[in-house]
Amino acid sequence: MKPFPRAEISRKALKHNLARLHELAPSSKVMAVVKANGYGHGLLNVAQCLDNADGFGLARLEEALALRTGGVTAKLLLLEGFFRIGDLTTLVEHDIETVVHHESQLEMLESINLTKPVTVWLKVDSGMHRLGFSPAQFDATYQRLMANDNVAKPIHLMTHFACADEPSNPSTAEQQRVFDTLIKGLPGDRTLANSAGALFWQQSQADWIRPGIALYGVSPVFGDLGAKHGLMPAMDLVSQLIAIREHKAGESAGYGSYWTAEKDTNLGVVAIGYGDGYPRNAPLGTPVLVNGRIVPIVGRVSMDMLTVDLGIDANDKVGDLAVLWGKELPVEEVAEHIGTIAYELVTKLTPRVAVCLD
């Protein structure tokens, strides 16, 4: 018996999206970003499905170790880098590469003797102003890494775009100009483009692209759809109706009597709530798909349940499926209705939601 609620993950869609990104960046290798539990799609499941990716990007060392333990032998890169000096020996032992973005990491690399050098990606802050060395710091930082026997050569080079998901924003081109000027003539691989860079800034694709959300069939642009770019949604978040009740005009529903019916109708209770990661702040009218039609959320989302207005002529039954987002109800549309981004919806699902690979 299949569990509810569950996130149904499509192998076909994941593989299609990776192939599509290869088409969009034919001269680049693809570092598939699978941090945050594969954007909620299952870390190991996604990595094993995308076994023809050229490498995988993670945020935390624990994520990388989970992939190694699961048998993944591909290139792994810690996008946040290492946090503690003891992490360096673990990186060497498990052949994990690291971003270097801060003075404290330089100091740790200079105060340890590793059994073999670690592969480093030096991060330039070209305008994001979150992680990375400023243009003024770059030359001295690069020379320190070059002089360090704990650092494998050549040193690879990277930056991250702040506004690539705004295709008309000129700051992305300026960030690329800053980066290209700094690293001109240096050896090593380059990577600039995230999902938005890969989709909208072909000139930024370089040696590697680092797609995250696009791998899962979702557009990185608010109000846009992945399908417009040839991507396929990889997740269907589904649950079921556990109760249907007749509801009279003037009756309220849910905590705080937040919603009151204007006319007679039928309400359906769906077994999913904020305890599963569905947003409590989903407003009235947020769409849910039941038996092929869109029905609106009414009342407040509670911990384990939410309520939808099925309509007066509903023929739905207890046990029928309710789709919170997926192929027929894009997560981008749900996110826009709620006032958030699709990234947040897919990554905030809790362990109560079973992740099922088809």
Swiss-Prot record:
GO CC list: cytosol
Positions with a binding annotation for substrate: 130, 303
MF terms in GO: alanine racemase activity; pyridoxal phosphate binding
Obligatory cofactor(s): pyridoxal 5'-phosphate
Swiss-Prot/TrEMBL keywords: Isomerase, Pyridoxal phosphate
Isomerase recorded as keyword: yes
Reactions catalysed, as given in the entry: L-alanine = D-alanine
Protein's GO biological process: D-alanine biosynthetic process
Enzyme class: isomerase
Family designation: Belongs to the alanine racemase family.
Matches recorded under PANTHER family: ALANINE RACEMASE (PTHR30511), ALANINE RACEMASE, BIOSYNTHETIC (PTHR30511:SF4)
Protein name, as recorded: Alanine racemase
Organism: Shewanella piezotolerans (strain WP3 / JCM 13877)
Source organism phylogeny: Bacteria, Pseudomonadati, Pseudomonadota, Gammaproteobacteria, Alteromonadales
